[in-house]
Each structure stands twice: as structure tokens, then as C-alpha cells.
Amino acid sequence: TFAYYKELEAGHENVRVVYYEGGFNYSKINNFGAAACRGDYFLLLNNDTEMIDGGCIREMLGYCMREDVGIVGAKLLYADDTIQHAGVILGFGGTAGHAFIGKSRYDTGYFGRILCAQDYSAVTAACMMTKREAFEAVGGMTEELAVAFNDVDYCLKVRKHGWLVVYDPYAEMHHYESKSRGYEDSPEKVERFNGEVEILLSRWRDQIEQGDPYYNPNLTLDNSDFSLRR
């Protein structure tokens, strides 16, 4: 990644690389990057992602330029071409979670939802485009959420300000999830994650308990396949 940054700096006059020197905090990193940006649209993108189609960014921008849209998320795939992200549903796991995890890239999903561009309550920030106007209106990302749920929180803030959050299935990337940072498998990481759960619930408990407006209450919250609630 860092070698690529140097290659970008050397080969493109219109590219400027800034370096964040602090410890890992996804919200702080993106707030730092946004403060250095000059454009009207920001692309938040993990370093463990890989484009499938070179037109992905242009595709997302097409939706993000609409006046009523504040955020656009992509369809993200594991290395085996199964779905890692196709939108986020409030209430999964008691907080929020990705829709259609593990389904085939070519699966249509519940009523074609994997393949249809649509509004969601949230999308992942592993690949998220957002308007500068929206980002600044809500004060950027919440820095108390260093790793988990900062994207969900940001999407809910933007929606509260009146913008839509759109999932775009035609913007596809591979996401080698947690390849760069590892999993939440140590006592310290588990404690931090549980703390971030509490922060999310302290901010959005009412919305989560009321149910996701883009999810049928007759469907289960126990897994991501949109099957009937038991």
C-alpha cells in the first residue's frame, strides 16, 4: 500500500497523499483525510479492497450527485465471489449487520434486492462515497467509534439530516475483510467492540428497536438471508 502511495505521488500531479500519524481509529483517519480534501465528493475505501470494474467510482458518483442522496455504498465480495456486503440492516445481531452474507455474486436475493439499486438505512464504509456537504453537515464520523459501527452511525446521522443512503449493486469490489488488521479475537478487541456496541445503542437505540424501515418486520433478524421470522 505505501509503495503504491509513492507511485501515485510520483506519477500524478493531481494526486496528493497525506499521512495520518496516530494509532488506528477509522473515524479519525477519515476525518483527517476529509479535512485535506478539496473535492465535493469523498470516497472512503479500505486498503483491503480491489476493484473488479474500473468504472466503479463513476457508477457510484452517478447516484451521489443526486441532490437527495448523501451516501452511496457498493456491492462487496469475498475472494470466492460470495457476498460480503449488499447493504446494512438495522437490528441484525441486536445492532446492525450486512445483508445477504455468503450468497453468490449472481444470486438475485429476496425479491431481487441483491441486484437492484435501492435505499438502505446504512452501507459499509469499506467502500462508501459521500457528499462533502453531507459529511460536513453532520460533523464527519464519530471518533468514539474507532473500529466498529462508525459507518452505521455516520449513515444514520446523514439520513437524519434528510439525505438518502443508496446501495449500488453495479459498483462491485472484492473486500478481503480484516486481512490488514485481523479479527476481533483478543480480550482487548472484544472489550473495545462491546464498548462500541454500547455507544451505538446509546445514540440510536430507538431507531434500532423500532425496526429498519427498509426491512420487513416479518423477516428474521437472526441471520442475513431475509428468511421468515420464527
Residue positions per predicted region:
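A recurrent flexible, glycine/aromatic-enriched loop bordering the glycosyltransferase active site
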Residues: N25-I29, A35, G91-E133, A137
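Short aromatic/hydrophobic "clamp" motif used to bind/position activated sugar donors
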Residues: F42
